[in-house]
Amino acid sequence: MEKLEFDHIGLITNEKKGNEVWVEKTRVWVTDFAHHPYRAEWLRYEPDSPVKGPVREKPHVAFRTSNLEKASKGMKVLLEPFDVGFAIVGFYESDDGAVIEFMRYKKEVE
């Protein structure tokens, strides 16, 4: 298995949170998990977001990896990898139904 490092947890909300940032590709407002004491990222989807199913309905756990393809081998693809500026991210579903985000950062981060 590809080496993984915990990055953050993503939680769905319908409430506006402070310091939200807009992600046009997925039409979602997100908070910066790096500024949360427990690395929680809040996601607030717009009604017309193209994101459907488990990614939009369930919390997710995100891991850093150097290779999304190797890390996600054998997993169901929920959202194909895309560029969010600072990283390439993709969403997958584990055998037991957990939503997993794999992230390949473009630069080293703490």
What are the roles of these predicted feature ranges?
Residues 1-35, 40-53, 76-110:
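Vicinal oxygen chelate
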Residues 10-12, 62-66:
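Short hydrophobic/aromatic beta-strand micro-patches
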Residues 58-60:
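Short active-site oxyanion
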Residues 68-74:
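Short amphipathic alpha-helices within nucleic acid-binding modules
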